[in-house]
């Protein structure tokens, strides 16, 4: 006579027998499905080349304007006259390079007090 424990053993042997190998988890199948969804979405949202060209030209124009403004600013700063004593004072007191001290003085139109205040803040 079979007891409850025997029935459970028989069921386990039937499902894991040599006829049916246990199925392996399919890890990569979900990635393929995700990729298919992404490509479908990308096809729906095609980028028009005219929009892309317009965006690139806007970015290029903005960059060229920024570069031109930077060059003009550098020309203005180069026109400012600074005293050698002021430059050396800032270099020794603030312990910064000559280029940084000169830049600070030029940005503050040669005013050593304003340059020192800006460097300490």
Swiss-Prot record:
UniProt entry keywords in alphabetical sequence: Coiled coil, Cytoplasm, Nucleus, Phosphoprotein
Superkingdom, taxonomy of origin: Eukaryota
Effect of residue 35 to A: Reduces ability to inhibit NAA10-NAA15 complex-mediated N-terminal acetylation, which results in increased N-terminal acetylation
Positions of post-translational Phosphoserine modification: 30
Region: Required for association with the NAA10-NAA15 complex, residue numbers: 52-121
Annotated Pfam families: UBA_HYPK (PF19026)
Compartmental location: Nucleus; Cytoplasm
Start and end residues of each stretch annotated as Disordered: 1-75
CC annotations in GO: cytoplasm; microtubule cytoskeleton; nucleoplasm; nucleus; protein-containing complex
Consequence the record notes for mutating residue 28 to A: Reduces ability to inhibit NAA10-NAA15 complex-mediated N-terminal acetylation, which results in increased N-terminal acetylation
Protein name: Huntingtin-interacting protein K
